[in-house]
Design a protein with these regions (language model features):
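Helix-loop boundary and gating motifs at the non-cytosolic
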Residues: 46-103, 288-293, 297, 301-311
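Helix-to-loop junctions at the C-terminal end of transmembrane segments
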Residues: 110-127, 337-350, 438-439
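C-terminal transmembrane helical hairpin of 12-TM major facilitator-type secondary transporters
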Residues: 354-398
Length: 543
């Protein structure tokens, strides 16, 4: 009898704690929204007082904010919100793990980006132009797929239809990102480029909030209680901001390389659409140094972010402390950092901004090393998390602006998709050993290691800058000497380059896909080796 009472008391205590934490999380989400709204409202006031912030109130940065909302919401629906939903309906953890595969289209989106760059859609392209026609077409399909995803009613043992719609939604969302990124680059003027990139990040975070806390609030019985199907359907209307922005902005500065060619043969079309975007990039001076830098620039920061939560738990902080420090203080610091990134570029120039933001991100990891040595100190945790989020926000805006400036206006979609995929592979694949390092050297040693891990990226940056391959202006393509190499890249070499990229992605995927770990890794290694042989095997020549 006493045992039953004791168990009942424990169960009630656990239930009370869960309800308390749930209430705190919902309260924190509301506070995050208030902080975010306050910063967005404050920006126009600051812009009227500080010239470096003035582009924030121009038309095009406002439009990129709207584009960012539509870009940011699908991935949150597919990862954070969806896994929460599946857990609520009793799907086991192993099955929920399939969500890892939903990130694959975002990683390999450069493979079909040439179609977005060069394939004209009947009727729509003539009316709206290349970018807007693709945007409206993909968004119509995305709207339908999200409704179908919400209506597919996942249950234990009956996940087939749900998984299919989730993969379709992921593919369409990745394609929407290709279009929006290219369109953003093409509508922004030089003097508002960095600010437009920052407002795009603000919009992306807004989409995250709506698809995360908003969708759960719509669906939950503790919120509006509308159910998951209706909640997902309502969230799908987040495509509307991008439609409004695109109609307001016009067609942009898209360059149609096919305009002068009538009756183009399939081989010519494939050469122009698929081969030339990669050839144009690879024939730039310092192309492989640039790719190496893109791959490594944020590795130290990514390793740290991967192991932050385990360290916080290990140091004995409560859930409430971590939620308030990370989701509230940290979120505010991230938004402020993102807003500061654009004036940072304006004040320092692109080269110095990349250098200093990289050093600041290294310093933020030193703060966590101090936290690990200090132990359970709430305000030290707040200071470290705020420093990390502030510097990451600055670095995110600066780095995204740099990648945008590397993209040729003739092949915007393909080249930006390639660069962003490369950056994503670097952040994910290179951060993979983080847990092993932490287990072997402890938390203080681990954070010291993350500082060292950031050094190769900074060394590559120094090489790029010293050779003149990074300049102070935002548009790197126009500013850096773009003369072709003495031996232009031939088609077999481009094929070899794509094989190497595919192999690196395969090595990345071999970590989460445990069911085929060794097979995937072996096949990926073969692709890398084959790509290197193809690159070496053909004498370079023009196509």
């Amino acid at each position: 009898m006493l045992l039953q009472k004791s168990l009942a008391i424990q169960e009630n205590a656990v239930s009370h704690l869960r309800n308390t934490l749930r209430g705190v999380r919902m309260s924190v989400d509301l506070q995050r929204f208030i902080i975010f709204a306050a910063i967005l409202i404050a920006l126009p006031v600051i812009a009227m007082l500080v010239p470096a912030f003035r582009p924030y109130i121009r038309k095009n940065p406002v439009i990129t904010f709207l584009l960012g909302i539509s870009s940011g919401f699908p991935l949150t629906l597919l990862v954070a919100t969806m896994t929460f939903w599946l857990a609520k309906v009793g799907i086991d953890t192993a099955t929920i793990g399939f969500a890892v595969a939903l990130g694959i289209p975002y990683t390999i989106k450069f493979l079909w980006a040439p179609l977005v760059d060069k394939l004209h859609l009947p009727v729509l392209t003539k009316i709206f132009g290349q970018r807007r026609s693709w945007l409206f077409f993909i968004q119509a399909l995305l709207f339908v797929s999200i409704w179908q995803l919400g209506a597919s009613n996942p249950q234990p043992g009956d996940m087939g239809l749900f998984a299919i719609w989730a993969l379709i939604t992921a593919f369409l969302s990745a394609t929407q990102d290709i279009v929006i990124d290219a369109y953003r680059i093409e509508i922004l003027e030089e003097e508002e480029f960095a600010h437009g990139t920052a407002t795009n990040q603000f919009g992306y975070r807004t989409g995250n909030l709506i698809a995360g806390a908003g969708t759960i609030y719509f669906a939950s019985q503790e919120g509006l209680g509308l159910g998951w199907a209706t909640a997902y359907g309502l969230t799908s209307f987040c495509i509307i901001p991008a439609i409004i922005g695109a109609l307001w902005a016009g067609p942009g500065k898209f360059v149609d390389r096919f305009a002068h060619v009538e009756g183009m043969k399939p081989k010519q079309w494939l050469t122009e659409a698929v081969v030339n975007p990669f050839r144009e990039f690879l024939t730039r001076h310092g192309a492989f140094l640039i790719l190496g830098f893109v791959l490594l620039y944020k590795v130290g920061d990514a390793m740290g972010q991967a192991m932050l939560s385990p360290m916080i738990v290990d140091l004995g902080f409560s859930d409430l402390d971590y939620i308030s420090a990370n989701k509230l203080w940290g979120f505010g610091a991230l938004i402020v950092g993102s807003a500061l990134g654009a004036p940072f570029i304006l004040w320092l120039g692109m080269g110095r901004a990349l250098l200093i933001s990289g050093l600041l991100m290294m310093f933020s990891n030193v703060m966590f090393m101090i936290l690990a040595a200090t132990g359970n100190s709430y305000w030290m945790m707040v200071a470290a998390i705020c420093t990390e989020n502030l510097t990451s926000g600055i670095g995110l805006t600066v780095f995204a602006t740099y990648l945008s400036g590397l993209s040729s206006i003739a092949y915007t979609a393909t080249q930006f998709a390639l660069l962003s995929s490369f950056a994503g592979v670097g952040r994910t694949f290179m951060a993979g050993p983080a847990g092993i390092v932490a287990e072997n050297v402890g938390w203080v040693g681990f954070w010291g290691f993350t500082v060292l891990a950031a050094i190769p990226g900074m060394v590559l940056f120094w090489l790029l800058w010293s050779k003149g391959y990074v300049v102070q202006s935002i548009h790197q393509v126009e500013a850096v000497d773009e003369k072709a190499l003495k031996e232009p890249v031939g088609p077999l070499r481009i094929f070899g380059f794509l094989l190497v990229v595919a192999g690196l992605i395969g090595l990345l995927l071999s970590q989460p896909l445990e069911f085929a770990n060794s097979i995937t890794a072996t096949f990926a290694a073969v692709l890398v080796a084959g790509g290197l042989l193809a690159w070496k095997g053909q004498p370079a020549r023009a196509i």
